[in-house]
Each structure stands twice: as structure tokens, then as C-alpha cells.
């Protein structure tokens, strides 16, 4: 059956329709059973606010997504959505889903994560434990990076990942991947942690910074629990 796709946005109270992702173009089919990541600079979707416009960088993000989510699929298939197709030629990934993402469900129902998925903490912690076991550092942790399928939290957005053998990077070099709101939150936290934005920083430190930053989206005590995995 041929699926008809449309742009997928997050409908955020007080802001309206917002891009679901700053890097790729998010697409969803009409009955919300298939989600597509299209790694292309679609100006209609991003409306001139594109974060990644360099084709080489877009290609790098695409290859990271395919690499790391495939690792997860191979070792921990229950923790990522079923991959329907990897279209290497057109840089599209198709996933089996059941409705809108985890974050959007809370927005649509004006409720908490606990209301949507009572054991979400345990499930998300299992995902981070899998990352740790595979030597993956994942910095795209926003709650829109998860779908729920048959009561199981499924993780996506592996374009901003590195592994235990990756060379340190400077935060300045990846600022185009990070929203302005997130950047405003990150700088004081980098200062508090003694991280120089222009200096190569080990990935274990960046992972700690990511968990610290996403306390704006998740309970602080839960992020602190996740940080312990990378100590």
C-alpha cells in the first residue's frame, strides 16, 4: 500500500506548530502508523530556519542516524521502532509507529509523562543503559525523540551520536544542531562544569552536560540517575 505523507510538526501551546526536528524533515502518514526521517534541507518545512544547510554535514548526520539506530536495532530491537525501510539513495528512514510522539501525546492531553506511560522512567533508563553497553553517547534527548508502540518506549534521533572511540569535539562545532533555547540553557551550565565551548571536550563530559541540560524537559532526579550511568 502506498502511503501518503505530510509534514509532521509538534503543536506546542503558546507557540503553535513547531518543527519536530532541526536537522531532517519530519514526515508522517495520514493514519500515523509510519514516521519518516528525510535527511534533506527542505526549505518549505524549515521555513528559512534550517539548522544544517551544508550538504556534507547533512550527509554526516544521515550516516550517524543509520549507523547507530542500526546498532540498536541489531542488539536491542525492543528499544527502537521497527525499521520498515532504509532508503539510502534518498536518505529516508521509515519507522512503524502508533500515533504521535511521546512529547506530543502529553501536549495533546495536557498531562504528564506518568499519565501517558506510568513506567516511562524505567523504560527510558533501559534505553540509556543500552547506549552505555554499546559505547554510544547520544545527545539528542528531547521527549519528541520517542514514540510509544504497544506500551513500549521507542527511541529515535541517533544523528547526534558518537561512540567510545570518537575523538573529543568542541561544543562550538555542533551548535548548528542545537536550538537557540537549548543554547541559552547550555552556556551557563558549561561554565558551571568548566567546559570551554571552543575546546575539544571528551564525550563522557558532553553526555553529562546533555543530561544536565534536559532537566528542562525531564525531572531533575531522573536525569541525575541517568548521569550515574556514565560516571
Regions found by a protein language model. Give the residues of each.
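Conserved hydrophobic "DFG−1" position in protein kinase catalytic cores
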Residues: 26, 38, 85, 95-97, ...
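C-lobe/activation-segment region of protein kinase-like
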Residues: 133, 137, 149-231
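Conserved hydrophobic core/spine positions of the Hanks-type protein kinase catalytic domain
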Residues: 123-130
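Catalytic-loop signature of eukaryotic-like protein kinases
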Residues: 140-147
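A short, low-complexity linker immediately N-terminal to eukaryotic Hanks-type protein kinase catalytic domains
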Residues: 2-11
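Protein kinase-like catalytic core scaffold
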Residues: 34, 79, 93, 154-155
Amino acid at each position: 500500500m502506498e502511503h501518503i505523507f505530510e509534514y509532521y510538526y509538534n503543536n506546542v501551546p503558546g507557540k503553535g506548530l513547531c518543527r519536530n526536528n532541526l536537522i531532517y524533515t519530519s514526515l508522517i502518514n495520514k493514519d500515523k502508523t509510519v514516521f519518516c526521517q528525510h535527511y534533506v534541507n527542505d526549505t518549505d518545512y524549515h521555513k528559512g530556519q534550517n539548522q544544517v544547510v551544508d550538504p556534507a554535514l547533512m550527509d554526516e548526520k544521515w550516516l550517524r542516524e543509520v549507523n547507530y539506530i542500526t546498532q540498536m536495532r541489531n542488539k536491542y530491537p525492543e528499544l527502537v521502532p521497527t525499521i520498515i525501510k532504509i532508503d539510502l539513495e534518498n536518505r529516508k528512514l521509515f519507522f512503524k509507529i502508533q500515533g504521535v510522539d511521546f512529547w506530543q501525546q502529553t501536549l495533546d492531553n495536557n498531562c504528564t509523562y506518568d499519565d501517558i506511560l506510568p513506567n516511562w522512567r524505567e523504560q527510558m533508563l533501559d534505553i540509556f543503559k543500552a547506549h552505555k553497553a554499546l559505547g554510544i553517547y547520544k545527545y539528542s534527548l528531547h521527549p519528541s525523540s520517542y514514540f510509544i508502540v504497544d506500551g513500549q518506549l521507542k527511541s529515535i534521533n541517533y544523528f547526534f551520536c558518537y561512540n567510545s572511540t570518537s575523538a573529543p569535539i568542541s561544543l562550538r562545532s555542533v551548535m548548528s544542531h542545537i536550538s537557540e533555547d537549548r543554547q541559552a540553557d547550555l552556556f551557563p551550565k558549561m561554565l558551571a562544569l568548566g567546559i570551554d565551548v571552543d575546546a575539544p571536550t571528551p564525550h563522557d563530559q558532553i553526555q553529562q552536560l546533555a543530561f544536565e541540560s534536559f532537566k528542562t524537559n525531564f525531572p531533575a532526579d531522573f536525569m541525575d540517575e541517568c548521569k550515574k550511568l556514565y560516571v
